[in-house]
Amino acid sequence: MQQDNVTKKVNILGDANVDMILNLSDKQNLREPSLFSGGSSANVASGLSKLGIDVSFFGSLGKDIYGKHVVDEMKADGIDISNLVLLDNYNTAMVIGVVEESSERHFFLWPPINGAHNQYTLDDTSRKDLLDCDWLHVSGISLRFSPVKETMLEAMRICNEKSKIVSFDLNLRSELWGLSESFKETVLEAVSYSSIVFGNLHEEILLIYDGNEDTLDKHISEKQTFICRDGHNGALGITNKDKVISNAIPISPIDSVGAGDAFNTGFIYASCCGKDIEESLDIGNQVAAFKLLGSGARHLPTKELLDDFNKKYQIN
């Protein structure tokens, strides 16, 4: 990858937590559980910062040992945490991930409700800081519970009104919480404020709409792009006029936890560097493939590591 001149600033609002990973992929050589920082939004913040993007994080954690773990890692990654709030009366959430022999994963959340990440609200200072960016990224994991749901929708709306790029990862987790009509309406409201919508093609995007990939473009406004992740098939970029396909990189995955966040990281990074949709999809796939070769959602590359990865796999 050639040296890129990055000038865009990205604000990320949403979830941060810790991940406890139980890896059962090799049952003959079981490993001890591993603790990582996690959270869909925080993962993207970490990945973008490692790639040289100026990143600020907006969210809340418990004032506990796990919250300190997350804060320390964000500081080490160079993320601005001026708008990260530590709460006395709520616990930092833990996502317990079980990795199967196929590298597929299953998640369990503790506490199941009222985690600290769901309590974030904006004040006058954070609203002002929120608009100090070129790009806002959010995740649908924050649409399930109040007050962070209302906070996220407000943030998306005001950034959209100020012509900021707003990217929204659907992150429905319908296998955990279902997909009620009222929640679907909330998701569609968030989509209406979005410039870019990320999601798994079959498990999320087609679930929200009519299940027909051929008519998906009819749901996309003139100023929107849908980025459809499709596992080993790669990814699609769809506008109301065009469709671009980027093939996945053939590798043997070790751990798929956080692969979608890694893809989003690569796509946003490339877009901030001025790449077109095709090259941004390609770089999204490269960062996702790099992540798949390591454990935990934070196995994410610097620019130098990504260059080395691309040379190894002979990616131009």
Regions inferred by a protein language model and the residue ranges of each:
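Glycine-rich phosphate/adenosyl-contacting loop at the front of the ribokinase-like
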Residues: 1-79, 252-254
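Short, conserved phosphate/pyrophosphate- and ester-handling motifs at nucleotide-, phospho-/glycolipid
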Residues: 48, 200, 260
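Anion (oxyanion) recognition and catalysis
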Residues: 49, 75, 157-161, 191, ...
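Hydrophobic beta-strand scaffold residues
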Residues: 55, 81, 166-168, 226
